Amino acid sequence: MPLFVRSSLITWVILVACCCSSTETAFSTQVPYRLRFFHTHTVERLDIVYRHGDKYDPDALARISHYLRDHRTGAVHEYDPRVFDLLHDLTLAIGRPDAEIDVVCGYRTAWSNEYLRSHGHGVATHSLHMQAMAIDIRVPGVSTSKLRDTALALHRGGVGYYAASNFVHVDVGRVRRW
């Protein structure tokens, strides 16, 4: 084999090895986005990494969407991943990155939404829960007022404070408060 061809081949092999190695290393060093949930109605728990750096895991997103299904009907809707990013950032901002988030309400079908409205629960007609863009939560050991204030400071969507019911609503719609 001529020297030029051999040296070009060796250079190519080294280049490929370096590229593969750096791609693998880059992925493995990306920060994992992890969420831990406890659903207050289904009594199910979920501990899941749904994102590495800027790459979402489609299987993990599907598992979380199923977990946050309408507990009255069993219907599942694909959640807006910005909700998960908001929850992740909220746990970091309250200084509890490994906190288990109590889910009071996730996705709601139109039927469940109307059921709650007709029973005087103060539910919005066009609730973002029906678009899988909202979630009602609390974090054990963190006051709901602190959770509310922290969510408001993030300016990432709507924040509703339900002190009497001990939960906070967060969504990824327009920034507003109630």
Predicted segment positions?
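Bacterial N-terminal signal peptides
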Residues: S8-C19
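N-terminal targeting signals for Sec/Tat export/insertion, comprising classic cleavable signal peptides
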Residues: F38-Y56
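N-terminal secretory signal peptides that target proteins for export/translocation
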Residues: M1-F4
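Active-site acidic/histidine clusters and adjacent loop/turn architecture
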Residues: H52-V104
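Catalytic cores and adjacent binding grooves of peptidoglycan-active enzymes
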Residues: Y33-F38, G122-W178
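Loop/turn elements at helix/coil->beta-strand transitions in domains of secreted/extracellular proteins
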Residues: E44, R96-I101, H155-G158, N166
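Boundary at the C-terminal end of the N-terminal hydrophobic targeting segment
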Residues: S22-S28
